[in-house]
Design a protein with these regions (language model features):
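Short, conserved beta-strand segments within well-ordered enzyme catalytic domains
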Residues: 35-36, 63-64, 68-70, 110, ...
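Conserved hydrophobic/aromatic pocket- or pore-lining residues that grip, position, or stack substrates
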Residues: 22, 43, 72, 104, ...
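Short glycine/serine-rich loop segments
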Residues: 96-98, 102-169
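Enzymes and membrane/adaptor proteins characterized by extended Gly/Ser/Thr/Asp/Glu-rich
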Residues: 30, 63-100, 124
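Immediate post-signal peptide segment of exported/extracytoplasmic ligand-binding proteins
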Residues: 50-68
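Short alpha-helical functional segments enriched in proximate histidine and acidic residues
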Residues: 25, 29, 46, 50-53, ...
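An N-terminal boundary/leader segment
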Residues: 1-45
């Protein structure tokens, strides 16, 4: 994050260019099945707003400016679908945002999409999902592992700077 923030401060990259880079990476790694939904328009709009905010007053941005984040499909994000990778929740739209979401947005992170997981986050291979198995970016013949495999692979494949996962442990 520090390197990205430094590049933004130096004007070497804009927030929009950063988001577009990650959107391209997502498109180029679709076969890994990490993402179940990409918030392309929303992420680009937020990036544009942050470009303007930073240009007007660099001190006004939050601690997580430049952090492009994917969120596991069990974490509620208001007005966005959340299915916990289960057919029973297909089409369910969250009525609220989880505290973690509220906090990262407050600090100017950009949420780029929702990532795959084991159904109801109960599993250790990330193969039990209505969206299909997540593939390991290092070796597509291997599983991603963990119920947060979509989150892990999203970072591993350089499709976001960070991803929220969970542990039901």
């Amino acid at each position: 994050l520090t390197a990205v923030q430094l590049d933004l401060k130096k004007g070497l990259i804009t927030f929009e260019e950063l988001v577009q880079y990650y959107l391209n990476q997502i498109e180029n790694t679709r076969d890994l099945n990490a993402y179940v939904e990409v918030y392309e328009k929303e992420a680009l709009k937020r990036a544009s707003e942050l470009d303007k905010k930073y240009k007007e007053n660099p001190e006004s941005v939050g601690k997580l400016f430049g952090m492009v984040v994917a969120i596991k499909d069990v974490i509620c994000y208001k007005d966005h679908e959340v299915t916990a990778a289960s057919k029973i929740l297909e089409g369910f739209t969250s009525l609220f945002s989880a505290t973690a979401i509220e906090r990262i947005l407050h600090e100017d992170a950009i949420i780029i999409g929702r990532v795959n997981c084991d159904q109801f986050a109960m599993g250790s291979t990330n193969e039990n999902s209505i969206y299909g198995a997540v593939r390991n970016a290092a070796n597509k013949n291997h599983v991603a592992g963990g119920s947060s495999g979509g989150s892990a692979v999203a970072v591993q494949a350089d499709t976001c700077l960070a991803a929220l996962g969970s542990d039901t442990g």
